[in-house]
Amino acid sequence: MTDKEQVVIYTDGACKGNPGRGGWGALLLYKGAERELWGGEPDTTNNRMELMAAIQALAALKRSCPIRLITDSEYVMRGITEWLPNWKKRGWKTASKQPVKNADLWQALDEQVARHQVEWQWVRGHTGDPGNERADQLANRGVAELPR
């Protein structure tokens, strides 16, 4: 599958204090078109914002399509590709029988992923990748636009 046939999505989360004021950002690219999404929450964590970025980006797509979603979050990457199937089998419990943190968002992400054909890709953050840098700027905008 070529990039021209896929929607390419870059996502990022930001948090000022952890927990604290947080934001999420997503850059969606398709056939030369771009769409920017961002938002924020007054009391959240970086991991929740990373998850929100992916959820909101996938939810913004009105119909099922092939996607390459690029994140700099090892938490999101490992969660969706390694941990989630076992959490579901165990009734949203970890291997140590503890409740999964952020289960509400993992469940929402799982629902969105089921609508599409998603290829996940991890990229190291803050290394100059243009899409990742834009997603980071959008996440910080989400924090900046929160009411004081």
From Swiss-Prot:
Top-rank taxon, per record: Bacteria
Entry keyword annotation includes Zinc: no
Stretch list, region Disordered: 125-148
EC category: hydrolase
Record's subcellular location: Cytoplasm
Catalytic function, reaction form: Endonucleolytic cleavage to 5'-phosphomonoester
Required cofactor(s): Mg(2+)
Boundaries of every RNase H type-1 domain copy: 3-144
Gene Ontology molecular function: magnesium ion binding; nucleic acid binding; RNA-DNA hybrid ribonuclease activity
UniProt cross-references to Gene3D superfamilies, sorted A to Z: Ribonuclease H-like superfamily/Ribonuclease H
Residues the entry annotates as binding Mg(2+) 2: 12, 136
Cofactor note: Binds 1 Mg(2+) ion per subunit. May bind a second metal ion at a regulatory site, or after substrate binding.
Binding site for Mg(2+) 1: 12, 50, 72
InterPro entries: RNase_H, RNaseH-like_sf, RNaseH_domain, RNaseH_sf, RNaseHI
EC numbers: 3.1.26.4
GO cellular component: cytoplasm
Keyword entries, A-Z: Cytoplasm, Endonuclease, Hydrolase, Magnesium, Metal-binding, Nuclease
Role summary: Endonuclease that specifically degrades the RNA of RNA-DNA hybrids.
Record text on subunit structure and interactions: Monomer.
Family: Belongs to the RNase H family.
Name this protein carries in UniProt: Ribonuclease HI
Organism per entry: Pseudomonas aeruginosa (strain ATCC 15692 / DSM 22644 / CIP 104116 / JCM 14847 / LMG 12228 / 1C / PRS 101 / PAO1)
